[in-house]
Amino acid sequence: MSFLDRIAECNAHDPAAYRPLISAGHTIGAVRHRLAQRLRDFPNVFTVSADAVHLLDIFKDADQRSQAVERVVRVLEADGIVRGRRNEAYPVLVNWGDAPLFRIERAAAPHFGIRSYGVHMTGYVRTPDGPQIWVARRAKNKPTYPGMLDNTVAGGQPVGIGLHANMVKECWEEAGIPLELARNAICVGAITYRMDGEDGLKPDVQFCFDLELPADFTPRNTDGEVDEFFLWDWRKTAEVVAETREFKFNCNLVLIDFFIRHGLIDPDRADYLDIVAGLRR
């Protein structure tokens, strides 16, 4: 196995399994054909054809669209199609920085192929032998990817909060990192992928942050979502990423990006440019 295997797993996607979801003239998602057939039961919200699913144009603003889609999501929840409500609203954007076309419950986003955004932070300790990386293990009772390894801090990007403020909030909740340290987190870029998941399409963007931590600081979880933290040499971290599937799928890409930016992957290796290109699809 290799870094390219992890990248390929995050980009396993069959476009033929979906039809586009269109709102206000923009393609903003993709719906599996089976769900598209179910959406025919909501003619006051969607128009469904063999080629696409359209959110009706009678909804004139983000609030109206959000309310209409939420009514459908509630029915899909009752049917057991959408599961694990998070009570967290994700923005539905045409482009990053735009005003949202509407908002959607986080758990429903992949069912509609909505691009989700998140923040992932690699916390590291500088040493003469290269960085040591704080690795989290997700709580065994988490509804998604329980017990898997994770980045030091990570979370979804909901409506109503900026990226850096969200990262600072997540730093405290997930790792007990106080404000005076967390505010030093630097956004260093983003990784993207397009992946077929159990619930639908995940065409997501994760903003990557780095945070150098003092040697005497130990993360501690405060919200029950992390069972433990490990401080690993970067070489061990890279080996686990390349040779196993112990990390949650997108965390692998965040760490590979970290290895590249910190000069830890040899640029003379034959697959170097494929790795670099694969992080942003």
Model-derived features: where do they sit?
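Catalytic-pocket segment enriched in acidic/His residues
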Residues: 173
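Short aromatic/basic micro-patch
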Residues: 231
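N-terminal leader/linker segments that precede catalytic domains of diphosphate-processing enzymes
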Residues: 1-148, 156-169, 177-220, 224-226, ...
